[in-house]
């Protein structure tokens, strides 16, 4: 899966229909997971509305659009659910996300920030959230600053 401008080497398989499903590896199972996991009408609209990153053209002449991978999609949904539950229960516990190098943590946080600021407006306690990203490397800090500034 990718966008119109995605280079071939960056296309990837959608290997789960729902969070918690086993990861598919056979070609037929991957095709089925892609069809059911991406192209069911409700899911497709959700992906199209909330999980495509468009870089602001003010910062670059290059047009950039990135669609989430399935782990980013399910992680964002799970984190949002955890944060909403925490706010409603006043537990003080939000969302924590740990990911391996190269798994798309920065984009996951961008997708989550979008969800919290645009899709949780009906939850008064969330309001206009302040989002803090804690990273352990300068490289991640610079990458995050660049991504959030350009989006």
Q: Language-model features: where?
A:
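ATP-dependent helicase/translocase motor core
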Residues: 1-135, 139-151
């Amino acid at each position: 899966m990718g966008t119109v401008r995605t280079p071939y080497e960056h296309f990837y398989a959608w290997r789960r229909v729902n969070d918690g499903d086993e990861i598919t590896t056979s070609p037929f199972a991957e095709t089925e997971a892609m069809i059911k996991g991406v192209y069911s009408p409700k899911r497709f609209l959700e992906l199209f509305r909330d999980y495509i990153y468009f870089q602001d053209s003010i910062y670059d002449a290059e047009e950039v659009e990135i669609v989430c991978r399935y782990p980013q999609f399910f992680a964002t949904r799970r984190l949002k659910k955890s944060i909403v539950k925490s706010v409603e229960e006043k537990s003080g516990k939000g969302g924590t996300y740990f990911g391996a190098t190269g798994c798309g943590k920065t984009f996951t946080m961008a997708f989550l920030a979008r969800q919290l600021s645009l899709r949780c407006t009906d939850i008064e306690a969330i309001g206009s959230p302040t989002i803090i990203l804690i990273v352990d490397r300068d490289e991640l800090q610079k990458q995050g600053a660049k991504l959030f500034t350009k989006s």
